[in-house]
Amino acid sequence: MIRAGGPSPSPRGRRAGPIRLPRRAPSSTPTRAKTEEKASADASSRTGADAEVQFEAVIGIETHVQLNCRTKAFCRCAAVYGDEPNTHCCPTCMGYPGTYPVLSEAVVRKAVQLGLGLNARVRRRSKFDRKQYFYPDLPKGYQISQFDEPIAEGGYIDVVIPVEDGGGVRRIGITRAHVEEDAGKLTHYPAKGDTPGYALADYNRAGVALVEIVSEPDMRTGREVAAYGAELRRLVRYLDVGDGNLSEGSMRCDVNVSVRPVGREAFGTKVEVKNMNSFNAMSRAIDFEIDRQTALIRAGKGDEIVQETRTWDEGRQCTVSMRKKEGLADYRYFPEPDLPPLVFDEAFVEKCASAMPELPGAIRARYADLGLPPADVQVLVEDKELVEYFDAALAAGAPAKQCANWLTGDVMAWLKNAKDVAVSSMPLSATQLAEFCTLIEDGVISGKIGKDILPDLLEGKEGNKSVGDIVEERGLKQISDPKEIEAIVDRVLEANPGQLEQYRGGKDKLKGFFVGAVLRESGGRANPALSNEILMRKLNEGR
């Protein structure tokens, strides 16, 4: 059981339509940007001992995961994306006097599952706090969050590291995961002529449940951080606690970057980078920020690196200063007086754990035991539906390596080009794919024939018909009789006496010509290994 509550809020006071606010002027200036660009240019031309010092980045990431609950965290307003502004608001999420928050059990359940998925210690008792700051997207003037007693702490994620950064699997530590409510969304409009700039506030998102996941500063490059973010999104999607959509803001990553000389234990000045709506953009933003800080240090301007929040400007491909970064004291945390401590028993945690699916790390290990190449494993694990489809094909008797090869290659290429076709709705059933791969594995049909008939299977032209029946009807069985293949080779050699004479005279490049000719003569049905063996024996008889 869980305990957390307060009186039910009133649904009255709802008001639709955008709220217009004066636009906050940005703190960055073109002059400052030019100074930073000049520092980078100056650093590239410096020589001497300072220029030879090697620097490394120290990177941690705070990830806000929006939970896919039907209602907000502390009221009954719908938690939906893209509806008309300010149509899912109530006195509770707008902070009206006399209203009290009531914690959703679904939020707790999903937060516990996410904590378990992060290999973290789920606390049986946690509490909520008020994080206070004043900004137009925060209607209450404070955010309900968790400060010193989060719902989960400690933990790790095993991340597949890009080859450029050494490859392999690296364990990234998780400091904590805590529940909080989201803020509203501001849309900024620039000044036009005599019309000043302004912002519109949409509070539909205010109060939507989040879990903030704070990593240890264990990462060193933009690619590593992007790999960590992608793995965290996989976990979120496998657990079905959120959709992890960066472009819609349901997963947002704030990256803390500092630079220090290699070998030094003390951290440099931490800079927060925000507003990256893809993992590719995240990698580029971090690498730019590392270069910016390194350039300033090398130019003797390290004191210009200040603790601040910077935004990634996709158009200019650079980070731009937004505001001074607040410290913990600035938020004036204190216990949320309207919510009791969150307490649940072991039975509740076990119930949450029992509903969890197999997670990406365990699937990778299982597929590695099947002997699948790491590249194929990564492609398969990327999509939960693809894993389910592949497992169904294995259960139907598909040879693992053959099936993974076709699924991650030709089938995925077809899906990429097809419009509005998901793995689950693909005409090619897992049973058909299993039979298809078995026929190739057993040598009944060749890979060439497989490529010829696969498009028809993917497009559903043969319905649910057995692949074996299709092969029989079309006469596509592979020719593996040595005498039959020898007759095909003889016909090819007899039809091309000039090329045969040139080959036997030393023009070895003509081998490919004869291989192709045999393939065409057999209609693509000749056993490749056997036909190559017989062809080479026949070609070399007169040399």
Swiss-Prot record:
- Any Pfam family from its record, for instance, is GatB_N
Q: Where is the composition biased (Basic residues)?
A: 12-23
Top-tier EC class: ligase
- Where is it mainly found? mitochondrion
EC number(s) reported in the record = 6.3.5.-
Q: Which GO terms describe its cellular component?
A: chloroplast; glutamyl-tRNA(Gln) amidotransferase complex; mitochondrion
- Localisation per UniProt entry: Mitochondrion; Plastid, Chloroplast
The annotated region (Disordered) lies at 1-47
Reaction equations catalysed: L-glutamyl-tRNA(Gln) + L-glutamine + ATP + H2O = L-glutaminyl-tRNA(Gln) + L-glutamate + ADP + phosphate + H(+)
> Listed GO molecular functions?
ATP binding; glutaminyl-tRNA synthase (glutamine-hydrolyzing) activity
- GO biological process entries: glutaminyl-tRNAGln biosynthesis via transamidation; mitochondrial translation
- List UniProt keywords, sorted A-Z: ATP-binding, Chloroplast, Ligase, Mitochondrion, Nucleotide-binding, Plastid, Protein biosynthesis
Instruction: Note the Gene3D superfamilies from the entry.
Output: 1.10.10.410
InterPro entries named in the record: Asn/Gln-tRNA_amidoTrfase_suB/E, Asn/Gln-tRNA_Trfase_suB/E_cat, Asn/Gln_amidotransferase, Asn/Gln_tRNA_amidoTrase-B-like, GatB, GatB_Yqey_C_2, Gln-tRNA_amidoTrfase_suB_CS, Gln_synth/guanido_kin_cat_dom
Top-level taxon of origin:
Eukaryota
Q: Name the SMART domains on file.
A: GatB_Yqey (SM00845)
Describe the protein's quaternary organization and the partners it interacts with. Subunit of the heterotrimeric GatCAB amidotransferase (AdT) complex, composed of A, B and C subunits.
Which purpose does this protein serve, as stated in its record?
A: Allows the formation of correctly charged Gln-tRNA(Gln) through the transamidation of misacylated Glu-tRNA(Gln) in chloroplasts and mitochondria. The reaction takes place in the presence of glutamine and ATP through an activated gamma-phospho-Glu-tRNA(Gln).
Regarding protein family, the annotation reads: Belongs to the GatB/GatE family. GatB subfamily.
Q: What additional remark is attached to this entry?
A: This protein may be expected to contain an N-terminal transit peptide but none has been predicted.
Protein name, entry field = Glutamyl-tRNA(Gln) amidotransferase subunit B-1, chloroplastic/mitochondrial
Native species: Micromonas commoda (strain RCC299 / NOUM17 / CCMP2709)
